[in-house]
Amino acid sequence: MYFEHNTQLGPPYQILLDTNFINFSIQHKLDIFKSLMDCLLAKAIPCITDCVVAELEKMGHRFRLALRLTKDPRFRRLTCNHKGTYADDCLVDRVKQHRCYMVGTNDKDLKRRLRKVPGVPLISVANHKYAVERISEDLAGL
């Protein structure tokens, strides 16, 4: 259904990940790379922005494992041209500019903001696995 509204989506899927998605994945003992491919039934490229890495660095010792995970070469590191932007703002702006991304998040506020951007699939951690959110009814009627 997303592909009818967003023709730029297609395998290999690029998934923008936020800090809490990475942290929830670790807490639920999910291998991000394998679990994304199992969920989407296709090759997936997890993407991390500089803002997300900076946010993990600011969170300190508690998030050191998540920070170490982002250094994995299988993650695509996306550079940010702005300074001091909140990571959620960075993700929303990037998705609005480039409709080729899916977004992995468990942040309720970020999900609410992203639902306003047509054709952007959301992935979240639920019941020890990843789940793709259904397309909203207002988009389905377009």
PLM features per residue range, with description:
Residues 1-75:
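Domain-level signal for Mg2+-assisted phosphodiester chemistry and nucleotide/NA-binding surfaces
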Residues 47-142:
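Nuclease catalytic cores that cleave nucleic-acid phosphodiester bonds
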